[in-house]
């Protein structure tokens, strides 16, 4: 009996121990878009000290409490602090002001900054014509982060903003998950390089390979080896052995996995000593998917159908959950109502291309061919339609995932 999606995922994730990932410390500039492997706490306050949010003058709020346009308060300017300079140590800050630039430390004894444009500047003095509330335009030490407070969370993707935050608190290295070494083999005598300018009758360009390379890199993998083989089991076996000798732990293949005359991958994997965990899942697209373990090489094999859309579905709904489990990541589901009624094959869980409407509903594209690529670019989400129904009425909540 063909496996349900949930049963197949359970079998897949049961083998995640075959792909142990180490934690490694990597220089900050090499961690972009990788996943943090540990929770991090702030090693210091941010800002590190009280500093000025404006170009202006530091003074005491009580010295200008009685200021008015008719009776401005005149304060001598006794110094200047630029960003990066040490503030002057004043014997008595009463009744005086100190010029400060944005980001400069606040001299001791002052509790407010008044902007340059809000004073009248005189020779070596300023005139203030309105009371200023204490604390105005002062960034307090630790108001953004306190030492020891949470900084970045385990599993967080290290975006440019995350790297900025880590740099601001002096982190030169970050703990990230090691990259899983993956080998990628596409198959098919009819498949030619994607850059080939012209095609002969019957040929197709290898569109799945660049997709998988980019997707694997985004998922934190090292694409260690890449190859394409024609419909030749012996050549396929030789390349697979070569990849394993290079330390590949996850072998990802596309094509030759269904029931046709040229679908040699299942038998070739068996001859290589792989143990098939499942072959075929009750889904559309992607039904012929095969998952196996390679005991001699301490690795796993995910053999995907060759149709491009089937490849994207198996990458999203099998490859991604496997890699997330390696890093103990959890994904929160999102459910939205259908914008229109949908008919689907009963008995198959369908992953169909869709878009969100302005009303926050999900519209399922009527074009769901597993070879149709344009709608992939035009879609924004996958709509997950359950196996046990052939008709879902408009308004029915369904789970959706971003493409």
UniProtKB/Swiss-Prot annotation:
Known pathway: Cofactor biosynthesis; molybdopterin biosynthesis
Pfam families named in the record: MoCF_biosynth, MoeA_C, MoeA_N
GO cellular component labels: cytosol
Cofactor note: Binds 1 Mg(2+) ion per subunit.
EC number(s) from the headed UniProt entry: 2.10.1.1
UniProt-listed SUPFAM superfamilies: MoeA C-terminal domain-like (SSF63867), MoeA N-terminal region -like (SSF63882), Molybdenum cofactor biosynthesis proteins (SSF53218)
Reactions it catalyzes: adenylyl-molybdopterin + molybdate = Mo-molybdopterin + AMP + H(+)
GO MF annotations in UniProt: metal ion binding; molybdopterin molybdotransferase activity
SMART domains per the UniProt record, alphabetical: MoCF_biosynth
Keywords for this protein: Magnesium, Metal-binding, Molybdenum, Molybdenum cofactor biosynthesis, Transferase
Cofactor(s) the record lists: Mg(2+)
Biological process per Gene Ontology, one example term: Mo-molybdopterin cofactor biosynthetic process
Functional note: Catalyzes the insertion of molybdate into adenylated molybdopterin with the concomitant release of AMP.
PANTHER family linked: GEPHYRIN, MOLYBDOPTERIN BIOSYNTHESIS PROTEIN
Family according to the record: Belongs to the MoeA family.
Name of this chain's protein: Molybdopterin molybdenumtransferase
Lineage: Bacteria, Bacillati, Cyanobacteriota, Cyanophyceae, Synechococcales
């Amino acid at each position: 009996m063909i496996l349900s999606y949930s049963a197949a995922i359970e079998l897949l994730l049961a083998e995640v121990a075959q792909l142990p990932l180490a934690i490694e410390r990597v220089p900050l500039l090499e961690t972009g878009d990788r996943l943090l492997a540990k929770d991090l706490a702030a090693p210091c306050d941010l800002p590190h000290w009280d500093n000025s949010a404006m170009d202006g003058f530091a003074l005491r709020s009580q010295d200008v409490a009685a200021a008015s346009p008719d009776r401005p308060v005149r304060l001598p300017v006794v110094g200047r602090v630029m960003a990066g300079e040490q503030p002057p140590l004043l014997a008595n800050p009463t009744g005086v002001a100190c010029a400060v630039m944005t980001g400069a430390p606040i001299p001791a004894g002052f509790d407010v900054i008044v902007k340059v444009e809000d004073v009248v500047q005189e020779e070596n003095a300023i005139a203030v014509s309105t009371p200023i509330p204490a604390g105005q335009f002062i960034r307090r030490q630790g108001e953004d982060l306190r030492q020891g407070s949470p900084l970045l969370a385990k599993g967080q993707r290290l975006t440019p903003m995350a790297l900025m935050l880590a740099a601001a608190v002096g982190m030169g290295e970050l703990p990230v998950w090691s990259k899983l070494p993956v080998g990628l083999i596409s198959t098919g005598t009819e498949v030619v390089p994607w850059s080939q300018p012209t095609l002969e009758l019957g040929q197709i360009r290898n569109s799945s390979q660049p997709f998988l390379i980019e997707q694997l890199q985004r998922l934190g993998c090292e694409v260690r080896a890449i190859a394409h083989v024609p419909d030749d089991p012996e050549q396929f076996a030789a390349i697979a052995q070569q990849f394993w000798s290079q330390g590949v732990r996850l072998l990802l293949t596309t094509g030759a996995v269904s029931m046709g005359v040229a679908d040699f991958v299942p038998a070739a994997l068996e001859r290589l000593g792989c143990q098939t965990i499942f072959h075929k899942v009750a889904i559309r697209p992607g039904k012929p998917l095969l998952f196996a373990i390679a005991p001699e090489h301490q690795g796993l094999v995910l053999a995907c159908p060759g149709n491009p859309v089937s490849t994207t579905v198996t990458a999203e709904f099998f490859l991604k959950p496997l890699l997330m489990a390696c890093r103990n990541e959890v994904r929160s589901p999102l459910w939205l109502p259908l914008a229109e009624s949908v008919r689907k094959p009963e008995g198959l869980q369908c992953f169909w291309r869709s878009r969100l409407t302005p009303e926050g509903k999900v519209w399922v594209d009527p074009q769901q061919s597993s070879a149709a690529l344009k709608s992939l670019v035009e879609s924004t989400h996958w709509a997950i339609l359950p196996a046990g129904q052939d008709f879902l009425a408009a308004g029915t909540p369904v789970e959706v995932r971003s493409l």
